[in-house]
């Protein structure tokens, strides 16, 4: 899953070396925390959050095969 997120996000940003994904797992969910540089935050979120929503939709669709709920948080 991390490879999928990286393959989507890295081409969008100017500083791909600053892209970091941190997984956090609980009994019922798996949360991926995506961190990008401040300069690239707008590119990842997009106008009215459209790009972020599209990334989340793909992650949720792929993760729906698991028993755990998958979440993606974009943090600074």
Curated annotation (Swiss-Prot):
GO MF annotations, alphabetized: RNA binding
State a single Pfam family of this protein: KH_KhpA-B
Q: Which InterPro entries match?
A: KH_dom-like_a/b (IPR015946), KH_sf_prok-type (IPR009019), KhpA (IPR020627)
The alphabetized UniProt keywords are:
Cell shape, Cell wall biogenesis/degradation, Chaperone, Cytoplasm, RNA-binding
Q: What Gene Ontology biological process does one annotation of this record name? A: peptidoglycan biosynthetic process
Signal as a keyword of this entry, yes or no, is no
Superkingdom as given in the UniProt entry: Bacteria
- Entry's family note: Belongs to the KhpA RNA-binding protein family.
The molecule here is called RNA-binding protein KhpA
Gene that codes for this? khpA
